[in-house]
């Protein structure tokens, strides 16, 4: 059975941090499913890429997925603004149950809402690192960091390393 990767996404995502990992995963034979506020709605990246949401967060069941991908840009901040905290709850399933969780740039912000970062080693874009540290994570400045089931990366320049690692984690 082909593995399915949930991608949580909102407006102002960093286009390349969505499209590049998605392409790497699909080229490796994995299915990707975009989860957002409402099924069949459209989200638009910072540079204009338009993506149709496959499954609304209200209908999304984390146990249906083999991994979670959280691209950066301003999308994670919008997702964290969900008044019901549904994206943090969705992500918590992955972190709590040791299911592969991939986050780049601002993406690790969502992981703060899982309350599962204490003692974890992560990386992220510079302006998110203090927040991760305050949530109990040990934060380092490396292109890719693997801590058990969580893979994090900093910026688009790290995408080759990030993509290689996330595919490896699912093989």
UniProtKB/Swiss-Prot annotation:
PANTHER family: DJ-1 PROTEIN (PTHR42733), DJ-1_THIJ_PFPI FAMILY PROTEIN (PTHR42733:SF2). Belongs to the peptidase C56 family. CDD domains: GATase1_PfpI_like (cd03134). It comes from Staphylococcus aureus (strain Mu50 / ATCC 700699). InterPro entries: C56_PfpI-like (IPR006286), Class_I_gatase-like (IPR029062), DJ-1/PfpI (IPR002818). PROSITE patterns: PEPTIDASE_C56_PFPI. Residues 3-171 form the PfpI endopeptidase domain. This is Uncharacterized protein SAV1875. It comes from the Bacteria.
């Amino acid at each position: 059975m082909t593995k399915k990767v949930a991608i949580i996404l909102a407006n102002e995502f960093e286009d390349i941090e969505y499209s590049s990992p998605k392409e790497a995963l699909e080229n490796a034979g994995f299915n990707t499913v975009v989860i957002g506020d409402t099924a069949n709605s459209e989200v638009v990246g910072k540079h204009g890429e338009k993506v149709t949401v496959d499954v609304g967060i209200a209908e999304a069941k984390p146990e249906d997925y083999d991994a979670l991908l959280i691209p950066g840009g301003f999308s994670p901040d919008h997702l964290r603004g969900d008044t019901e905290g549904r994206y943090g709850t969705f992500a918590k399933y992955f972190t709590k149950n040791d299911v592969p969780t991939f986050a780049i740039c601002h993406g690790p912000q969502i992981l703060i809402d899982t309350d599962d970062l204490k003692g974890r080693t992560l990386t992220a874009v510079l302006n998110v690192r203090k927040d991760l540290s305050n949530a109990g994570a040990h934060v380092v400045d490396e292109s890719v960091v693997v801590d058990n089931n969580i893979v994090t990366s900093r910026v688009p320049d790290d995408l080759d390393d990030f993509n290689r690692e996330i595919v490896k984690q699912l093989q």
